[in-house]
Amino acid sequence: MNFHKSFQLNGKTFANPNEIIDFSKEISSEIHLFLKDWFSEKRILEVKTSGSTGLPKTIAIKKEFFINSAMSTAEFLDLKEGTVALMCLPPKYIAGKMMLVRALVLGWHLDIVSPKSNPLENNDKTYDFSAMVPLQLEHSLLKIDQIKKVIVGGGVVTSQLQEKLQGIQSVVFATYGMTETVTHIALKKLNHFLPSVGFESFASFYQLLPNVKIYKDTRNCLVIDAPKVTEEIIFTNDIVDLVSDRHFEWLGRFDNVINSGGIKLHP
C-alpha cells in the first residue's frame, strides 16, 4: 500500500512506508500497529465497533473501502492535497483510523495529539480540518476558529451547543455513520447557513456523500446502500424522514437506546 508524496506526520516527511511505521512508534502503540497493518499485504483489516448501539464487536473491512471513504469526504468538503489536519480522536476506533487514512491517501499534513477534552489546549496552530466528539467541541469553543472545517460525531450535538456555534468562523458539520460504513455516509451543516430558499433549507438536514443511496424499511428506519464502503445493505434502527433522495432528517432510535459514551456518529 503506497502513500501520497505530500503526506506529513507531525511535521515530518517520509521516503518510504517503513519510515512512517518506525516514526509512529514514538506516537502510540495503537497507531504503530494500525500502520503496520495498513502497509502490509493484508487486503482486509479488522476494526472494533464502539458498542454505541449494541454489544462491541470486531468487523472486517477491505482497505479499498477505507480509501473510498477518504475520497468521498475529501470531495464533499473540498479537502485537497496539503490539507493541514488535526487528529484528536482515539486510534482504537474507526473515526481515529480514518483520520490517518485520509492523510496518507490524500497527502495531508497531519498533527496527532492525545485524545482529551480540549485538544486545542496549548496549541495555537491553524488547521484546515479536524474531527471531534461533542465534548471536545464544547471545550474548544474559545479556540475553535483555529480550525476552518470541523466534523463532529460520537454523540448528539445539543441545541445549546449548536447555538454557540453560530458565532464562530469555523464551519461545523454533524456526521452520520458507523463502523460498518467506514465512518460517515452523510453530513449535516450546523452553522453558516445561507438564507433559506422556499419552505425549508436542505442545510438543516443530513446530506449524503457521493455513491450512497438510502431508503426506509417498514419501521421507517434508514436503510443504507453504499457499495463503495460496504458490500452489505445496512439496516439501521434510526427512524428518519426522507426529505429528498439525497437528504434526510434523523428523528430518533427505533429501540430508543443511545449510548453516548461510544462513538456512533463517526467523523
Where does each model-flagged region fall?
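AMP-binding/adenylate-forming
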Residues: K62-N68, V84-H139
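Gly/Ser/Thr-rich phosphate-binding loop
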Residues: S140, I144-P195
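Conserved ATP-dependent adenylate/AMP-binding module captured primarily in the ANL superfamily
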Residues: M1-E26, I67-L86, K116-D128
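Conserved AMP-binding A3 loop
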Residues: I44-N68, D78
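Active-site glycine-centered loops adjacent to acidic/histidine catalytic or metal-binding residues
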Residues: V133, G154, G177, D238, ...
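AMP-binding/adenylate-forming core of the ANL superfamily
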Residues: K213-D241, H247
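Conserved pre-ATP/AMP-binding loop-to-beta segment of ANL
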Residues: E30-K48, G82
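AMP-binding/adenylate-forming catalytic core of the ANL superfamily
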Residues: N237-P267
